[in-house]
Amino acid sequence: MTSGPSQPFPSASGPDDGPSWPRILGRLTTGQNLPNGHAAWAMDQIMTGAATPAQISGFAVSMKMKRPTASEVRELADIMLTHARRVPTDEIGTDTVDIVGTGGDGANTVNLSTMASIVVAACGVPVVKHGNRAASSLSGGADTLEALGVRIDLGPDDVARSVREVGIGFAFAPQFHPSYKHASIVRREIGVPTVFNLLGPLTNPAGPRAGLIGCAWADLAEVMAGVFAARGSSVLVVHGDDGLDELTTTTTSTIWRVQGGTMERLTFDPAAFGFKRAEISELVGGDASENAAEARAVLGGAKGPVRDAVVLNAAGAMVAHAGLASDAQWLPAWEAGLARAVEAIDSGAAEQLLARWVRFGQQL
Protein backbone atom coordinates (compact mmCIF):
# COMPACT_ATOMS: atom_id res chain seq x y z
CA MET A 1 0.00 0.00 0.00
CA THR A 2 1.37 3.44 -0.87
CA SER A 3 1.41 6.28 1.59
CA GLY A 4 -1.06 9.10 1.08
CA PRO A 5 -0.11 12.63 0.05
CA SER A 6 -0.47 13.88 3.64
CA GLN A 7 2.30 11.54 4.82
CA PRO A 8 4.76 13.67 6.83
CA PHE A 9 7.35 10.96 7.52
CA PRO A 10 9.48 10.51 4.38
CA SER A 11 12.47 8.24 4.69
CA ALA A 12 15.89 9.86 4.47
CA SER A 13 17.36 6.60 3.19
CA GLY A 14 15.55 6.27 -0.08
CA PRO A 15 12.39 4.37 -0.99
CA ASP A 16 13.86 0.93 -0.30
CA ASP A 17 14.41 1.73 3.37
CA GLY A 18 11.30 3.81 3.95
CA PRO A 19 8.37 2.65 6.03
CA SER A 20 5.67 0.46 4.49
CA TRP A 21 3.22 -1.99 5.98
CA PRO A 22 4.97 -5.13 4.65
CA ARG A 23 8.32 -3.87 5.96
CA ILE A 24 6.95 -2.87 9.37
CA LEU A 25 4.84 -6.01 9.88
CA GLY A 26 7.70 -8.16 8.61
CA ARG A 27 10.01 -6.78 11.27
CA LEU A 28 7.47 -6.98 14.09
CA THR A 29 6.42 -10.57 13.33
CA THR A 30 10.07 -11.64 13.44
CA GLY A 31 10.69 -9.89 16.75
CA GLN A 32 12.73 -6.97 15.42
CA ASN A 33 12.50 -3.39 16.69
CA LEU A 34 11.44 -0.74 14.20
CA PRO A 35 13.82 1.90 12.82
CA ASN A 36 13.28 5.42 14.11
CA GLY A 37 10.20 7.03 12.59
CA HIS A 38 8.53 3.81 11.44
CA ALA A 39 6.17 3.53 14.42
CA ALA A 40 5.26 7.19 13.89
CA TRP A 41 4.55 6.50 10.21
CA ALA A 42 2.31 3.56 11.10
CA MET A 43 0.39 5.56 13.71
CA ASP A 44 -0.14 8.41 11.28
CA GLN A 45 -1.51 5.97 8.71
CA ILE A 46 -3.89 4.64 11.37
CA MET A 47 -5.01 8.07 12.60
CA THR A 48 -5.64 9.46 9.11
CA GLY A 49 -7.73 6.46 8.05
CA ALA A 50 -5.20 5.32 5.44
CA ALA A 51 -4.56 1.97 7.16
CA THR A 52 -6.92 -0.96 6.64
CA PRO A 53 -8.44 -2.83 9.61
CA ALA A 54 -6.20 -5.80 8.82
CA GLN A 55 -3.09 -3.61 8.88
CA ILE A 56 -4.17 -1.97 12.14
CA SER A 57 -4.86 -5.28 13.90
CA GLY A 58 -1.67 -6.87 12.58
CA PHE A 59 0.35 -3.91 13.83
CA ALA A 60 -1.36 -3.70 17.22
CA VAL A 61 -1.00 -7.40 18.06
CA SER A 62 2.49 -7.98 16.65
CA MET A 63 3.89 -4.88 18.36
CA LYS A 64 2.57 -6.10 21.73
CA MET A 65 3.96 -9.61 21.16
CA LYS A 66 7.34 -8.28 20.08
CA ARG A 67 7.32 -6.06 23.22
CA PRO A 68 7.54 -2.43 22.16
CA THR A 69 10.45 -0.22 23.11
CA ALA A 70 9.96 3.06 24.94
CA SER A 71 11.00 4.97 21.82
CA GLU A 72 8.42 3.12 19.68
CA VAL A 73 5.63 3.76 22.19
CA ARG A 74 6.65 7.39 22.50
CA GLU A 75 6.37 7.78 18.71
CA LEU A 76 2.88 6.26 18.78
CA ALA A 77 1.74 8.51 21.64
CA ASP A 78 3.27 11.66 20.16
CA ILE A 79 1.54 11.12 16.81
CA MET A 80 -1.74 10.42 18.59
CA LEU A 81 -1.36 13.74 20.42
CA THR A 82 -0.65 15.64 17.19
CA HIS A 83 -4.08 14.50 15.97
CA ALA A 84 -5.82 15.23 19.30
CA ARG A 85 -7.96 18.11 20.46
CA ARG A 86 -6.02 19.64 23.36
CA VAL A 87 -7.24 21.01 26.68
CA PRO A 88 -6.06 24.65 26.94
CA THR A 89 -3.55 24.97 29.78
CA ASP A 90 -2.88 28.72 29.74
CA GLU A 91 -4.83 29.08 33.01
CA ILE A 92 -4.70 25.63 34.64
CA GLY A 93 -1.05 24.96 33.77
CA THR A 94 0.48 21.49 33.51
CA ASP A 95 1.34 20.89 37.19
CA THR A 96 -1.76 18.69 37.22
CA VAL A 97 -2.05 14.98 37.90
CA ASP A 98 -3.78 12.06 36.17
CA ILE A 99 -4.72 8.75 37.78
CA VAL A 100 -5.34 6.20 35.07
CA GLY A 101 -4.54 2.63 34.12
CA THR A 102 -4.11 0.60 30.98
CA GLY A 103 -7.03 -1.67 31.81
CA GLY A 104 -6.76 -5.24 30.65
CA ASP A 105 -6.03 -6.79 34.05
CA GLY A 106 -9.21 -8.89 33.81
CA ALA A 107 -10.00 -8.40 37.50
CA ASN A 108 -13.12 -6.22 37.09
CA THR A 109 -12.36 -4.24 40.24
CA VAL A 110 -14.33 -1.19 41.34
CA ASN A 111 -13.17 2.09 39.78
CA LEU A 112 -10.34 2.78 42.22
CA SER A 113 -8.63 5.41 40.07
CA THR A 114 -11.89 7.32 39.62
CA MET A 115 -12.55 7.43 43.37
CA ALA A 116 -8.92 8.27 44.09
CA SER A 117 -9.07 11.16 41.59
CA ILE A 118 -11.94 12.73 43.52
CA VAL A 119 -10.06 12.34 46.81
CA VAL A 120 -6.89 13.90 45.35
CA ALA A 121 -8.84 16.87 43.99
CA ALA A 122 -10.47 17.31 47.41
CA CYS A 123 -6.93 17.65 48.82
CA GLY A 124 -6.39 20.67 46.58
CA VAL A 125 -4.24 18.93 43.96
CA PRO A 126 -5.61 19.70 40.46
CA VAL A 127 -6.64 16.58 38.53
CA VAL A 128 -7.24 16.04 34.82
CA LYS A 129 -8.54 12.50 34.49
CA HIS A 130 -8.29 10.95 31.04
CA GLY A 131 -10.62 8.00 30.57
CA ASN A 132 -13.09 6.04 28.54
CA ARG A 133 -15.96 3.62 28.82
CA ALA A 134 -15.28 0.01 29.72
CA ALA A 135 -13.38 -2.06 27.19
CA SER A 136 -13.15 -5.39 29.01
CA SER A 137 -14.69 -4.74 32.44
CA LEU A 138 -18.35 -4.12 33.25
CA SER A 139 -17.81 -0.44 34.01
CA GLY A 140 -15.04 1.96 33.03
CA GLY A 141 -14.25 5.26 34.68
CA ALA A 142 -16.50 7.17 32.29
CA ASP A 143 -19.43 4.82 32.92
CA THR A 144 -19.14 5.22 36.67
CA LEU A 145 -18.75 9.01 36.55
CA GLU A 146 -21.83 9.21 34.34
CA ALA A 147 -23.77 7.11 36.87
CA LEU A 148 -22.61 9.52 39.59
CA GLY A 149 -24.09 12.40 37.61
CA VAL A 150 -20.84 13.87 36.27
CA ARG A 151 -20.93 15.23 32.69
CA ILE A 152 -18.41 13.20 30.73
CA ASP A 153 -18.88 14.76 27.30
CA LEU A 154 -17.24 18.16 27.85
CA GLY A 155 -15.05 19.78 25.22
CA PRO A 156 -11.57 21.26 25.77
CA ASP A 157 -12.59 24.66 27.15
CA ASP A 158 -15.14 23.24 29.60
CA VAL A 159 -12.71 20.60 30.88
CA ALA A 160 -10.20 23.38 31.62
CA ARG A 161 -12.93 25.41 33.29
CA SER A 162 -13.92 22.37 35.38
CA VAL A 163 -10.33 22.02 36.62
CA ARG A 164 -10.18 25.74 37.37
CA GLU A 165 -13.52 25.96 39.20
CA VAL A 166 -13.94 22.49 40.76
CA GLY A 167 -10.36 21.24 40.94
CA ILE A 168 -10.96 18.26 38.66
CA GLY A 169 -11.88 17.70 35.02
CA PHE A 170 -12.63 14.60 32.96
CA ALA A 171 -11.30 14.31 29.42
CA PHE A 172 -13.43 11.66 27.69
CA ALA A 173 -11.07 10.00 25.22
CA PRO A 174 -13.44 9.86 22.20
CA GLN A 175 -14.05 13.62 22.53
CA PHE A 176 -10.34 14.40 22.35
CA HIS A 177 -9.03 11.66 20.07
CA PRO A 178 -11.59 11.53 17.23
CA SER A 179 -8.96 10.19 14.80
CA TYR A 180 -8.41 7.20 17.07
CA LYS A 181 -11.80 5.80 16.04
CA HIS A 182 -10.18 3.66 13.33
CA ALA A 183 -8.05 1.89 15.93
CA SER A 184 -10.74 1.67 18.61
CA ILE A 185 -13.10 -0.28 16.33
CA VAL A 186 -10.38 -2.84 15.60
CA ARG A 187 -9.40 -2.97 19.26
CA ARG A 188 -12.96 -3.82 20.26
CA GLU A 189 -13.32 -6.46 17.56
CA ILE A 190 -10.16 -8.42 18.35
CA GLY A 191 -10.82 -8.24 22.10
CA VAL A 192 -7.27 -8.91 23.34
CA PRO A 193 -4.86 -6.39 24.85
CA THR A 194 -2.61 -4.71 22.30
CA VAL A 195 0.01 -1.97 22.24
CA PHE A 196 -2.91 0.48 22.09
CA ASN A 197 -3.70 -0.30 25.75
CA LEU A 198 -0.54 1.60 26.66
CA LEU A 199 -1.51 4.75 24.79
CA GLY A 200 -4.48 6.04 26.82
CA PRO A 201 -2.38 6.91 29.88
CA LEU A 202 0.27 8.47 27.61
CA THR A 203 -2.06 10.74 25.64
CA ASN A 204 -3.90 12.88 28.21
CA PRO A 205 -4.91 15.94 26.13
CA ALA A 206 -4.11 18.31 29.01
CA GLY A 207 -0.51 17.09 29.25
CA PRO A 208 -0.33 16.73 33.05
CA ARG A 209 3.25 16.50 34.27
CA ALA A 210 2.41 14.16 37.16
CA GLY A 211 0.57 10.86 37.30
CA LEU A 212 -0.19 7.59 39.03
CA ILE A 213 -0.25 5.29 36.04
CA GLY A 214 -1.34 1.67 36.35
CA CYS A 215 -0.11 -1.01 33.96
CA ALA A 216 -1.52 -4.54 33.87
CA TRP A 217 1.72 -6.01 32.43
CA ALA A 218 4.93 -5.88 34.45
CA ASP A 219 7.26 -5.93 31.43
CA LEU A 220 5.38 -3.10 29.70
CA ALA A 221 5.17 -0.95 32.84
CA GLU A 222 8.88 -0.33 32.48
CA VAL A 223 8.37 0.68 28.83
CA MET A 224 5.71 3.20 29.86
CA ALA A 225 8.02 4.55 32.55
CA GLY A 226 10.66 5.10 29.88
CA VAL A 227 8.27 7.27 27.88
CA PHE A 228 7.42 9.38 30.93
CA ALA A 229 11.13 9.70 31.80
CA ALA A 230 11.88 10.99 28.29
CA ARG A 231 9.16 13.60 28.78
CA GLY A 232 10.54 14.76 32.13
CA SER A 233 7.34 13.79 33.98
CA SER A 234 6.99 12.97 37.69
CA VAL A 235 5.10 9.70 37.61
CA LEU A 236 4.68 6.47 39.50
CA VAL A 237 4.01 3.66 37.03
CA VAL A 238 2.54 0.88 39.15
CA HIS A 239 1.83 -2.80 38.66
CA GLY A 240 0.16 -4.81 41.40
CA ASP A 241 2.03 -8.05 41.91
CA ASP A 242 -1.42 -9.68 41.81
CA GLY A 243 -1.78 -8.35 38.24
CA LEU A 244 -3.87 -5.24 38.99
CA ASP A 245 -3.24 -2.03 37.07
CA GLU A 246 -3.40 -0.16 40.40
CA LEU A 247 -1.51 -0.03 43.66
CA THR A 248 -2.93 -3.17 45.22
CA THR A 249 -3.71 -3.99 48.84
CA THR A 250 -3.76 -7.78 48.33
CA THR A 251 0.04 -8.05 48.13
CA THR A 252 3.03 -5.93 47.09
CA SER A 253 3.21 -3.70 44.02
CA THR A 254 6.11 -2.92 41.73
CA ILE A 255 6.60 0.81 41.23
CA TRP A 256 8.70 2.50 38.59
CA ARG A 257 9.39 5.93 40.10
CA VAL A 258 10.02 8.47 37.34
CA GLN A 259 11.48 11.80 38.40
CA GLY A 260 13.90 14.26 36.83
CA GLY A 261 14.36 12.11 33.73
CA THR A 262 15.42 9.03 35.72
CA MET A 263 13.69 5.73 36.51
CA GLU A 264 13.95 3.68 39.68
CA ARG A 265 12.27 0.32 40.28
CA LEU A 266 10.91 -0.31 43.77
CA THR A 267 8.89 -2.97 45.56
CA PHE A 268 6.13 -1.34 47.57
CA ASP A 269 4.38 -3.06 50.47
CA PRO A 270 1.30 -1.25 51.83
CA ALA A 271 1.63 -3.27 55.05
CA ALA A 272 4.58 -1.00 55.90
CA PHE A 273 2.02 1.80 56.28
CA GLY A 274 -0.37 -0.30 58.34
CA PHE A 275 -2.71 -1.51 55.58
CA LYS A 276 -4.35 -4.90 56.08
CA ARG A 277 -4.03 -7.44 53.28
CA ALA A 278 -7.23 -7.61 51.24
CA GLU A 279 -8.59 -10.40 49.08
CA ILE A 280 -9.04 -9.55 45.41
CA SER A 281 -12.71 -10.57 45.73
CA GLU A 282 -13.20 -7.67 48.17
CA LEU A 283 -12.21 -5.18 45.44
CA VAL A 284 -14.38 -6.60 42.65
CA GLY A 285 -17.01 -4.25 41.25
CA GLY A 286 -20.17 -4.56 39.21
CA ASP A 287 -21.90 -2.46 36.59
CA ALA A 288 -21.84 1.34 36.50
CA SER A 289 -24.67 1.82 38.98
CA GLU A 290 -23.15 -0.65 41.46
CA ASN A 291 -19.72 0.99 41.17
CA ALA A 292 -21.28 4.43 41.59
CA ALA A 293 -23.01 3.24 44.78
CA GLU A 294 -19.68 1.93 46.06
CA ALA A 295 -18.03 5.27 45.24
CA ARG A 296 -20.72 7.18 47.13
CA ALA A 297 -20.28 4.89 50.13
CA VAL A 298 -16.49 5.26 50.20
CA LEU A 299 -16.57 9.03 49.72
CA GLY A 300 -19.21 9.12 52.45
CA GLY A 301 -16.78 7.54 54.91
CA ALA A 302 -17.52 3.79 54.70
CA LYS A 303 -14.57 1.79 56.03
CA GLY A 304 -13.19 -1.39 54.51
CA PRO A 305 -10.91 -2.80 51.80
CA VAL A 306 -12.16 -0.52 49.00
CA ARG A 307 -11.55 2.60 51.08
CA ASP A 308 -8.04 1.33 51.90
CA ALA A 309 -7.24 0.87 48.20
CA VAL A 310 -8.67 4.29 47.32
CA VAL A 311 -6.62 6.00 50.06
CA LEU A 312 -3.48 4.17 48.93
CA ASN A 313 -3.90 5.15 45.27
CA ALA A 314 -4.83 8.75 46.12
CA ALA A 315 -1.70 9.01 48.25
CA GLY A 316 0.39 7.57 45.40
CA ALA A 317 -0.90 10.25 43.04
CA MET A 318 -0.01 12.95 45.57
CA VAL A 319 3.48 11.45 45.96
CA ALA A 320 3.89 11.70 42.17
CA HIS A 321 2.63 15.29 42.22
CA ALA A 322 5.01 16.16 45.07
CA GLY A 323 7.81 14.80 42.88
CA LEU A 324 7.45 17.83 40.59
CA ALA A 325 9.57 19.58 43.25
CA SER A 326 13.20 18.50 43.04
CA ASP A 327 13.55 18.25 46.83
CA ALA A 328 10.67 15.78 47.29
CA GLN A 329 11.40 12.95 49.72
CA TRP A 330 9.85 9.51 49.32
CA LEU A 331 8.71 8.45 52.80
CA PRO A 332 7.59 11.88 54.05
CA ALA A 333 5.61 12.34 50.82
CA TRP A 334 3.84 9.00 51.39
CA GLU A 335 3.05 9.80 55.01
CA ALA A 336 1.67 13.22 54.07
CA GLY A 337 -0.32 11.83 51.13
CA LEU A 338 -1.95 9.09 53.20
CA ALA A 339 -2.89 11.53 55.97
CA ARG A 340 -4.32 14.03 53.47
CA ALA A 341 -6.37 11.34 51.69
CA VAL A 342 -7.90 10.10 54.95
CA GLU A 343 -8.69 13.66 56.03
CA ALA A 344 -10.30 14.49 52.65
CA ILE A 345 -12.72 11.59 53.07
CA ASP A 346 -13.40 11.86 56.80
CA SER A 347 -13.93 15.64 56.73
CA GLY A 348 -16.54 15.29 53.98
CA ALA A 349 -14.37 17.26 51.53
CA ALA A 350 -14.30 14.47 48.93
CA GLU A 351 -18.06 13.98 49.05
CA GLN A 352 -18.57 17.75 48.74
CA LEU A 353 -16.19 17.97 45.79
CA LEU A 354 -18.16 15.30 43.92
CA ALA A 355 -21.37 17.27 44.57
CA ARG A 356 -19.72 20.45 43.22
CA TRP A 357 -18.49 18.56 40.16
CA VAL A 358 -21.99 17.25 39.41
CA ARG A 359 -23.45 20.73 39.90
CA PHE A 360 -20.83 22.26 37.59
CA GLY A 361 -21.95 19.98 34.74
CA GLN A 362 -25.63 20.67 35.35
CA GLN A 363 -25.08 24.43 35.05
CA LEU A 364 -23.34 24.32 31.67
Swiss-Prot record:
InterPro entries listed in its UniProt record: Anthranilate_Pribosyl_Tfrase, Glycosyl_Trfase_fam3, Glycosyl_Trfase_fam3_N_dom, Glycosyl_Trfase_fam3_N_dom_sf, Nuc_phospho_transferase
Feature: compositional bias, Polar residues: 1-10
Positions of region (Disordered): 1-22
GO biological process terms held by the UniProt record: L-tryptophan biosynthetic process
Keyword DNA repair found: no
Biochemical pathway: Amino-acid biosynthesis; L-tryptophan biosynthesis; L-tryptophan from chorismate: step 2/5
Name of the top EC class for this enzyme: transferase
Catalytic activity: N-(5-phospho-beta-D-ribosyl)anthranilate + diphosphate = 5-phospho-alpha-D-ribose 1-diphosphate + anthranilate
UniProt key word Glycosyltransferase: yes
Sequence positions that bind anthranilate 2: 187
Keywords: Amino-acid biosynthesis, Aromatic amino acid biosynthesis, Glycosyltransferase, Magnesium, Metal-binding, Transferase, Tryptophan biosynthesis
Annotated residues for binding of 5-phospho-alpha-D-ribose 1-diphosphate: 101, 104-105, 109, 111-114, 129-137, 141
Cofactor note (record): Binds 2 magnesium ions per monomer.
List of residues binding anthranilate 1: 101, 132
Binding positions for Mg(2+) 1 per the UniProt entry: 113, 246
E.C. number: 2.4.2.18
Family: Belongs to the anthranilate phosphoribosyltransferase family.
Entry function: Catalyzes the transfer of the phosphoribosyl group of 5-phosphorylribose-1-pyrophosphate (PRPP) to anthranilate to yield N-(5'-phosphoribosyl)-anthranilate (PRA).
UniProt name for this protein: Anthranilate phosphoribosyltransferase
High-level lineage: Bacteria, Bacillati, Actinomycetota, Actinomycetes, Mycobacteriales
Gene expressing this chain: trpD
